[in-house]
Amino acid sequence: VTKAIDKLEETEGTITIGGYDLAALTRADLAEAVVLVPQVPFLFADTIFHNICYGIKREVTLEEVREAARRASIDADIMQMPGQYAFLVAEAGHNLSGGQRQRIALARAFLRTPRILILDEATSALDNTSEKQIQVEFERMKEVYGTTILSIAHRLTTLKNLRSNCCDGPRKDRSTGHV
């Protein structure tokens, strides 16, 4: 599904989201409407502020970025770093933990408030407390902005609030965490 959304050609059938046929949309249309947060997010050598603002086409204030970071449970960590939002991220975020990298990418998504949010193991490096806080923000995003969220995950807790779900392979006992 993520490959189809990334504009690779389907061999048969169509994919529609919100009534739009993905094959009819341009890359620019997709970039505006869809945000993908992968398991290993793209971070570049620049400040945390600029990493969170990546892909935004408007002027963004520090307060907007901080609010997005709060929603992603990363603001407190950033405020402890030298330079705070001016802290320089190493190429690929190698001077940050895996969880910090994921939360920065999630802050980027919260700042953009997309129509469609695709989470591909986007919380796999987070502790349970952070994941629960971020799940609340996903719910808020759905309610306030009408965002459609497609979540690809192995952890059952990541999928518990979804309206519908599907599995690759036979379904097992959900109470054990095995699907």
Briefly describe each language-model feature range.
Residues 1-2, 49:
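Post-Walker A alpha-helix
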Residues 10-20, 30:
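Conserved ABC transporter NBD signature motif
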Residues 16, 21, 77-80, 88, ...:
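Conserved beta-strand positions that form and line the central face of beta-propeller blades
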Residues 32-40, 48-51, 68-72, 86-179:
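ABC-family ATPase nucleotide-binding domain "signature/switch" substructure
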Residues 63-80, 84:
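Conserved ABC ATPase "signature" region
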